[in-house]
Amino acid sequence: MPLLNTLATPYAEALLQVTDGRSESDDVAAQCKELLAVWDSSTALRDAMTSPVLEPAAKKQALAQLLAEQIKPSLMNLLKVLADRQRLTALDAVLRRYLELYRESRNISLAHVRCAQALSDDQTKALTAKVQSMVGTGSVEIDLTIDASLIGGFVINIGSQVIDASLSGQVRRLGLSLAKAS
């Protein structure tokens, strides 16, 4: 188990236990996704919260002003604990681990899908249904990213399984088979 995952797991497990007890796991999971998106996209926020120069009290105050109205108290308490213990550098790992544990406890599979272009709602529903039938779990969560280098089609990653239905993948496979034939 990687060191960061070892550090993140106890915090994530504690948060899941608290949110399950308060019946707010679904809300907190959605808030974790939103917070991760902000954390990943805002270098200024990340730099400020992970700076050793800022005191934990200042970090807690800033987090409270930024997020208090938007997140559940249990998630805010986690952020404050991480700030107190100088562990905000691991925030993304803790949130990702929480989401993993949340999905595990709810029997939800995560499928990473790369598409050449954005999918319509109908295409997304059809893709979700197809992936769900392949996986066989209770439900599937789709993490969709646009990758123009695929030219057309999509690539699905579910755990260690990869399904490449992209045009670039077909061209690559055709090139390999032609190279073998010559």
UniProtKB/Swiss-Prot annotation:
Keywords: ATP synthesis, CF(1), Hydrogen ion transport, Ion transport, Membrane, Thylakoid, Transport. Disulfide bonds: none annotated. It is a peripheral membrane protein. The keyword Translocase does not apply. It is found in: Cellular thylakoid membrane. GO terms for cellular component: plasma membrane-derived thylakoid membrane; proton-transporting ATP synthase complex. It comes from the Bacteria. The keyword Transport applies. GO terms for molecular function: proton-transporting ATP synthase activity, rotational mechanism. F-type ATPases have 2 components, F(1) - the catalytic core - and F(0) - the membrane proton channel. F(1) has five subunits: alpha(3), beta(3), gamma(1), delta(1), epsilon(1). CF(0) has four main subunits: a(1), b(1), b'(1) and c(10-14). The alpha and beta chains form an alternating ring which encloses part of the gamma chain. F(1) is attached to F(0) by a central stalk formed by the gamma and epsilon chains, while a peripheral stalk is formed by the delta, b and b' chains. F(1)F(0) ATP synthase produces ATP from ADP in the presence of a proton or sodium gradient. F-type ATPases consist of two structural domains, F(1) containing the extramembraneous catalytic core and F(0) containing the membrane proton channel, linked together by a central stalk and a peripheral stalk. During catalysis, ATP synthesis in the catalytic domain of F(1) is coupled via a rotary mechanism of the central stalk subunits to proton translocation. Belongs to the ATPase delta chain family. This is ATP synthase subunit delta. It comes from Synechococcus sp. (strain WH7803). The lineage of its organism: Bacteria, Bacillati, Cyanobacteriota, Cyanophyceae, Synechococcales. The gene is atpH.
